[in-house]
Swiss-Prot record:
It is found in: Cytoplasm. It is an enzyme of class 2 (transferase). Coiled coil: none annotated. This is Glutamine--fructose-6-phosphate aminotransferase [isomerizing]. Catalyzes the first step in hexosamine metabolism, converting fructose-6P into glucosamine-6P using glutamine as a nitrogen source. The active site is at 2 (nucleophile), 605 (for fru-6p isomerization activity). It holds the Pfam family SIS. SUPFAM superfamilies: N-terminal nucleophile aminohydrolases (Ntn hydrolases), SIS domain. InterPro entries: GATase_2_dom, GFAT, GFAT_N, GlmS/AgaS_SIS, GlmS/FrlB_SIS, Ntn_hydrolases_N, SIS_dom, SIS_dom_sf. Residues 2-218 form the Glutamine amidotransferase type-2 domain. Residues 278-426, 459-600 form the SIS domain. GO terms for cellular component: cytosol.
Amino acid sequence: MCGIVGAVAQRDVAEILINGLHRLEYRGYDSAGVAVINKQNELQRIRCLGKVKALDEAVSEKPLIGGTGIAHTRWATHGEPSETNAHPHSSGTFAVVHNGIIENHEELRELLKSRGYVFLSQTDTEVIAHLVEWEMRTTDSLLDAVKKAVKQLTGAYGMVVMDSRHPEHLVAARSGSPLVIGLGIGENFLASDQLALLSVTRRFIFLEEGDIAEITRRTVDIYDTHGNKAKREIHESNLENDAAEKGKFRHFMQKEIYEQPTALINTMEGRINHENVIVDSIGNGAKGILEKVEHIQIVACGTSYNAGMVARYWFESLAGVSCDVEIASEFRYRKFVTRPNSLLITLSQSGETADTLAALRLAKEKGYMAALTICNVAGSSLVRESDLAFMTRAGVEVGVASTKAFTTQLAALLMLVTALGKVKGHISVEKEREIIKAMQSLPAEIEKALAFDTEIEALAEDFAEKHHALFLGRGAFYPIAVEASLKLKEISYIHAEAYAAGELKHGPLALIDADMPVIVVAPNNELLEKVKSNIEEVRARGGQLYVFADKEAGFTPSEGMKIITMPKVNDIVAPIFYTIPMQLLSYYVALIKGTDVDQPRNLAKSVTVE
């Protein structure tokens, strides 16, 4: 969600800070700000409502000169989007930027008011600034003041604090919201995402839960939740500096849709050969864990949850292991029964999704045999805190609407299903070879699906004046319909819903009329005849049908029904394949609607607070 960048250097850092914010724009925000300690040890601050570009222009008009600074993009939680509520917030010589939610901010606000502090904003973050200023009255150490302040906070935070009286120091604290340190030569950096710092370093330390860090130009000191000095592993990033550039594409989402063949190759590389899935590639000790598994519990949010729903069909039909899938924000707040020898699987693009991370921590207390995460970001909290980590290697995904993260999660899940089925003796050698062959053909098949972009773009014109849409699917294509409806509503703002096609008679049929487009995913499989019956129900009521099917399904266009004839692919990987035309449809409808494709309103890429 919000973005943080900090720097301590010999050189002026304002440009580094603002460039970092530009790289974090994909996370979603409504205002931005930057503060620098100048050469006279004075705090200078500029904030603005709107885009980072406006902040950049303001700094160009009134340059900020200094080697220590912090910057922030805000996504409003407490207080409306405004310049006054934008970060950094200050108190005397202090400035602070903060991601997260301070749950006891009202209580602390009243306490600080009683001590004479005047609040200028509606935010919970201003409480932190005043609290640190108060604690600094009894110490000359910024680190100690921050330590005392955070002990009084309840909630989630990733924060960076600076004090103009200590001009070469930044102090950061992490509890429930990610922070990463970037290591330079004679300079060091902080950010909420390593992507912000790729132009200045490739060496990173990911702060762990409860860590507090003090950085100067030449030193980095980290203290754990008990106050003891801690050593944290240094990670060398292999992300490209231009990973957050659109290149020849109009939008990041479009770029990421077209990157999927390569992303899938990267996901599979070194994990499958011509005949089988390499079980050990899932992680050290994976085979021993899989041999004992009797149940799978998948926990995820949003698009990742939809990937888990597809995987449930695979786990049960291919591997013969029962599987439950639950939304993380529901899972963590209900009383549940842990099944014997149950493997917990978390899915998250960022590895920092707040509810999923909290669900993992809860599950550790509930007797799950092990926790495996399928994730795209190395060094993230889910990766560090899970027993096994299966990295999707999708590369940086900037568009808020997830595309390649979804398909690579599905590929990773299918490899896991195959490995589990093989270990459990439920998948034969011949079946494994069939799955491997189908997976290896996927990148080329997806290239064929991408070739339908012109046809789908023309189809999208039909949605120009539409305000509602209905998606239908059966079996493993029901969650693909759910994912398609999510994409359409996210980026085009069309109210879209998805149903298992067999549920039409149980309510949704009442919505069907000539103004309701109905998109059906209907490849030729064992459920096709059932889907055809559902299609006839829609036709009989004048609904406008858009059917995505292969030639073998036998559909012919007619009045009120358009057919998009896709190539035939293996049934096992067909859910991944049919995701592509759904993504293209959503993208082109959003273009026609004129919405902000990469940064849709009210949404953020990484949901790092509840």
